[in-house]
Amino acid sequence: MSRIGKRPIALPAKVEVQIEGQQISVKGPKGELSRSLPPLIAVHQEAQTLKVSRVNESRPARQLHGLCRTLVANMVDGVSRGFERRLELVGVGYRASTQGNKLILNVGYSHPVEIPFPPGIQIAVEGNNVIVVSGIDKELVGNTAARIRAVRPPEPYKGKGIRYVGEQVRRKAGKSGKAKK
């Protein structure tokens, strides 16, 4: 039995779950998410908990069990509390701002980089150098934050670039060079 898959998912007070075959919909104060589950996985609602089980003991069913339980738990978490990723810009003159549904980054290129954000994602800029990506879909929040970071990942010599708040950047020593005469 999957150690993660066998744990029940607690449903908060204001969260409603609808299960129709392999389609599961979760509705809460922050919004609504739905996902289609593989045919090897079944979800049952018991009072204020959800149980994820597998249909048989085949290897693919065992592989998907813990994954599907975590995906459903993230849906419940997202519609009740939401998710957030914070990024910081490190570098002289690096700035971020929002304009409509676009994030505009000035990160040392000859032009500002515009990143449209998908529906269901909110992006806020704190100060000029902290970007907050939030939403109810954990996967979408993480992918959007990764796309922003990929514009200018931190470089190992000076540490300039876009990084997650709290991320440790491995630094390298520069060239030592020979002594000048």
From Swiss-Prot:
InterPro entries in the cross-refs: Ribosomal_uL6-like (IPR000702), Ribosomal_uL6-like_a/b-dom_sf (IPR036789), Ribosomal_uL6_a/b-dom (IPR020040), Ribosomal_uL6_bac-type (IPR019906), Ribosomal_uL6_CS (IPR002358)
Pfam families membership: Ribosomal_L6
GO biological process, alphabetically ordered: cytoplasmic translation
Domain of life from the UniProt record: Bacteria
Binding partners and assembly: Part of the 50S ribosomal subunit.
Function: This protein binds to the 23S rRNA, and is important in its secondary structure. It is located near the subunit interface in the base of the L7/L12 stalk, and near the tRNA binding site of the peptidyltransferase center.
Cited NCBIfam families: L6_bact
Family: Belongs to the universal ribosomal protein uL6 family.
Listed name of the protein: Large ribosomal subunit protein uL6
Species whose genome carries this gene: Synechococcus sp. (strain JA-3-3Ab) (Cyanobacteria bacterium Yellowstone A-Prime)
Gene name of the encoded protein: rplF
